[in-house]
A protein has these predicted regions:
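Basic, helix-initiating cap at the start of DNA-binding domains
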Residues: 1-22, 26-38, 55, 63, ...
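N-terminal intrinsically disordered/low-complexity leader segments
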Residues: 1-4, 184-191
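Polytopic alpha-helical membrane proteins, predominantly small-molecule transporters/carriers
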Residues: 15, 101-102, 109
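Short hydrophobic/aromatic patch on the recognition helix
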Residues: 38-47
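Alpha-helical DNA-contacting segments of helix-turn-helix folds
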Residues: 47, 51-62
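Hydrophobic alpha-helical connector segments
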Residues: 63-103
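Hydrophobic/aromatic-rich alpha-helical bundle segments in the mid-to-C-terminal region
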Residues: 135-178
């Protein structure tokens, strides 16, 4: 078969169409490649397996690490987190509400995909924690900020996906952060 432009994109579109039509489990790699008009060999140049079609290209942990480590000295860790979450929301999710929602529903429908998603969350948490430790933050504080960052990201993602498509995810990040600050502001004073 001759070289075809945008092979990766064609494979992704074909896979998601088939997942929607017949389900994730029932879809095979040969079906995906036939739909895309490509060979199975081409598929495996881009993806290790069909699961990786969903999770491939996920460089968010590397982006998070670079953003945190590259932030100017003296900036409050929470300000770094907020800026990072807003940036990811705008760069990765804006204008993709329906597409992201379809992927999220697919992930939640399959136990093997939920496991991979949990691994992704852990990888992101580790990347954020390590980056803050590299900035000189105490390891226990870095762990708290990392867990909080990933929790806020996923709460915002879920709230955004269940709301109207016109809402900006960055605005939902701000709402979730406001909710967290409201809870923390109500904490009893230390005795």
């Amino acid at each position: 078969m001759r070289w075809s432009p945008d092979a990766r994109g064609r494979l992704e579109r074909a896979a998601f169409e088939l997942f929607a039509e017949q389900g994730y489990q029932a879809t095979t790699v040969p079906q995906i490649t036939a739909r895309a008009g490509l060979t199975t060999r081409t598929f495996f140049r881009y993806f290790a397996d069909k699961r990786e079609v969903i999770f491939a290209g996920d460089e968010i942990p590397d982006l998070a690490r670079a953003a945190i480590e590259g932030a100017p000295a003296g900036i409050d860790p929470l300000d770094i987190v907020v800026h990072g979450l807003r940036t990811v929301a705008d760069d990765r999710f804006e204008g993709r509400h329906d597409e992201v929602g379809s992927v999220r529903r697919l992930v939640l429908s399959e136990s093997s995909l939920r496991e991979r998603d949990a691994r992704k969350r852990a990888d992101l948490t580790d990347a954020v924690r390590e980056a803050f430790v590299n900035r000189g933050l105490d390891p226990s504080e870095a762990a708290v900020i990392a867990e909080t960052t990933v929790m806020l990201f996923h709460l915002a993602l879920d709230a955004w996906l269940t709301g109207p498509a016109e809402r900006r995810m960055a605005d939902v990040v701000d709402e979730q952060l406001g909710a967290l600050r409201g809870v923390l502001d109500r904490r009893p004073a230390a005795s």
